[in-house]
Amino acid sequence: MSKVSFKITLTSDPRLPYKVLSVPESTPFTAVLKFAAEEFKVPAATSAIITNDGIGINPAQTAGNVFLKHGSELRIIPRDRVGSC
């Protein structure tokens, strides 16, 4: 089984820390979101993953589909920051 890698950046931190995650392409993207949120110590239930262009990603698909549609560079935003200036 092949793997896909994502570089996920935490946009709510001014230092823009990132993590690189490699997961099997059949992994549910909800699991990727949950793991990334835990790594950044933000609540997974109130976080969203978006593309660098600001397009939200529906987590109800596999990691392989997300990789094919959106590429490897993604951002995680805690939802308390969504829409704030």
Curated annotation (Swiss-Prot):
Changing residue 81 to C: In HLD14; decreased ability to form thioester bonds with UBA5 and UFC1; decreased protein ufmylation; does not affect the cellular response to endoplasmic reticulum stress. Its main location: nucleus. InterPro entries: Ubiquitin-like_domsf, UFM1. This is Ubiquitin-fold modifier 1. UFM1 precursor is cleaved by UFSP1, promoting its maturation: processing of the C-terminal Ser-Cys dipeptide is required to expose its C-terminal conserved Gly residue. It comes from Homo sapiens (Human). Interacts with UBA5. Interacts with UFC1. Pfam families: Ufm1. GO terms for biological process: brain development; negative regulation of apoptotic process; negative regulation of protein import into nucleus; protein K69-linked ufmylation; protein ufmylation; regulation of intracellular estrogen receptor signaling pathway; response to endoplasmic reticulum stress; reticulophagy. Residues 84-85 form a propeptide. Changing residue 38 to A: Abolished ability to be activated by UBA5. Induction: Up-regulated by thapsigargin. It comes from the Eukaryota. There is a cross-link at residue 83 (Glycyl lysine isopeptide (Gly-Lys) (interchain with K-? in acceptor proteins)). Belongs to the UFM1 family. The keyword DNA repair does not apply. It is linked to Leukodystrophy, hypomyelinating, 14: An autosomal recessive, severe disorder characterized by atrophy of the basal ganglia and cerebellum, hypomyelination, severe developmental delay, typically without intentional movements and language development, and microcephaly. Almost all patients exhibit spasticity, extrapyramidal movement abnormalities, and severe drug-resistant epilepsy. Disease onset is early in infancy, and most patients die in the first years of life. Ubiquitin-like modifier which can be covalently attached via an isopeptide bond to lysine residues of substrate proteins as a monomer or a lysine-linked polymer. The so-called ufmylation, requires the UFM1-activating E1 enzyme UBA5, the UFM1-conjugating E2 enzyme UFC1, and the UFM1-ligase E3 enzyme UFL1. Ufmylation is involved in various processes, such as ribosome recycling, response to DNA damage, transcription or reticulophagy (also called ER-phagy) induced in response to endoplasmic reticulum stress. The gene is UFM1.
